[in-house]
Regions:
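Conserved Class I S-adenosyl-L-methionine
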Residues: 99-119
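Short acidic low-complexity segments
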Residues: 43-54
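Flexible, glycine-/basic-rich loop-and-beta segments that form/coincide
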Residues: 10, 135-153
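Conserved beta strand-loop-helix elements of the APE1-like EEP
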Residues: 128-136
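Conserved class I S-adenosyl-L-methionine
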Residues: 14, 19-27
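Conserved beta-strand signature within the Rossmann-like core of class I S-adenosyl-L-methionine
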Residues: 81-90
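A short glycine-rich, Lys/Arg-flanked "PGG" loop and its adjoining helix->strand segment in the class I
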Residues: 71-80
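Short, charged/polar "capping" segments at the starts of alpha-helices
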Residues: 29-35, 94-96
């Protein structure tokens, strides 16, 4: 597959770099991450192995409470500057409702210094938001509040 073709795939849009073991957690049964041989030699875990440091995670969530419960475990098992994507239902989704959107529901991650940096459309039902540790985000001084300036919401 040429580099141009790869960028058209979901994994390409998510900046997947060939990691040999990844997490795809809480995905719908009919969700397909890749077609063909793209993940042929990759171990895809559907739960986080607490003993393994992951470089690439995709976690589907529908409620803020799920973010609150999953975030600490995901961050504990994420390698330094690993790729962490949270997928949430679009407002136009026909498969149910969510209390999450691009701008709301991510406080549990923000409280641990992770902020949404990139967004991609997964399919007609889901969007994905990449979270990154503030220490790796350039020009952070004006974009994000310092820890002691955050609201208690």
């Amino acid at each position: 597959m040429s580099n141009g073709d790869k960028m058209k795939t979901l994994l390409g849009k998510m900046n997947y770099k060939g990691q040999k073991r990844i997490v795809v957690m809480n995905a719908d049964k009919d969700f397909t991450l890749a077609s063909g041989d793209e993940l042929r030699d990759v171990q895809v875990d559907t739960d986080i192995d607490l003993r393994y440091p992951y470089e690439f995670m995709i976690i589907f969530v529908r409620k803020i409470s799920e973010v609150r419960n999953i975030a600490p475990v995901a961050l504990h098992n994420l390698t330094d500057d690993g790729m962490l994507w949270f997928c949430y239902q679009k407002k136009s989704s026909k498969k149910g409702s969510s209390d999450l959107d691009r701008d709301h529901g991510w406080k549990p991650l923000n409280d641990m210094d992770f902020y949404g940096m990139s967004m991609v459309s997964v399919n007609e039902e889901w969007s994905a938001l990449r979270f990154r540790n503030i220490k790796y985000i350039k020009a952070t001084s004006s974009m994000f509040p310092k820890k002691d300036q955050r609201s208690s919401k």
